[in-house]
């Protein structure tokens, strides 16, 4: 029974990846607005109905790692080693994200399309909320605590600044050193 579940989950992951890869290739090649979801489904050899079982919208095809990114942010806080601060754990996580930053071509695609920019903004707001909730839980603060929300917002905003810098690792170290000196838990 376990093998069947494993195979089924593996097949679902392969289908999801095939859809996301086909979509990105077509969007980069021809432009987001010029590609329909039927073309993406055909390129991945699935039906449009199947496409929408995996992705709720055309925009979601571009952000196929949305849930993974959020889960990793929360895990960075909850799964940090004993004795490591939340800020230090987030610094390490943001550095890992920076090292696997999206390509310039991908970023241009997002910036060129209002629907994708809006989706990305809403996605990062969801991640910010989840991260703030995780920080609050770890700090013993009530959900919605403004300092936890501010830390989450600052950390996620810093990601963009770090990726845009010519020396991302150095930029991250400087930003998080400032944060570490200034942000204290009470």
Please provide the spans of the model-predicted regions.
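C-terminal peripheral helix-coil segments that are non-catalytic and often amphipathic
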Residues: 2, 133, 137, 168-186
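Amphipathic C-terminal alpha-helical segment
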Residues: 122-123, 152-170, 181-186
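Amphipathic alpha-helical packing segments from all-alpha helical-bundle domains
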Residues: 114-139, 145-153
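Hydrophobic alpha-helical connector segments
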Residues: 71-108
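Basic, helix-initiating cap at the start of DNA-binding domains
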Residues: 1-30, 34-46, 63, 72
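Hydrophobic/aromatic residues within well-ordered alpha-helical segments
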Residues: 15, 65, 69, 86, ...
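A secondary-structure capping/hinge motif
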Residues: 59-61, 111
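Short hydrophobic/aromatic patch on the recognition helix
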Residues: 46-55
């Amino acid at each position: 029974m376990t093998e069947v579940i494993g195979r089924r989950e593996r097949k679902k992951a392969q289908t999801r990846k095939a859809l996301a890869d086909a979509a990105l290739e077509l969007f980069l090649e021809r432009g987001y607005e010029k590609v329909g979801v039927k073309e993406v489904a055909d390129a991945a050899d699935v039906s449009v109905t199947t496409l929408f079982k995996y992705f709720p919208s055309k925009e979601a095809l571009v952000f196929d790692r949305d849930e993974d990114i959020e889960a990793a942010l929360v895990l960075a806080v909850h799964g940090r080693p004993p004795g490591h601060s939340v800020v230090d754990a987030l610094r390490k996580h943001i550095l890992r994200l920076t090292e696997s930053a999206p390509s310039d071509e991908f970023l241009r695609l997002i910036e060129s399309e209002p629907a994708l920019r809006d989706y990305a903004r809403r996605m990062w707001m969801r991640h910010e909320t989840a991260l703030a909730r995780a920080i609050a839980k770890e700090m013993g603060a009530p959900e919605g605590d403004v300092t936890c929300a501010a830390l989450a917002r600052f950390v996620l905003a810093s990601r963009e600044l770090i990726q845009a810098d010519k020396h991302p690792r150095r930029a991250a170290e400087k930003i998080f050193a400032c944060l570490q000196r200034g942000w204290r838990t009470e």
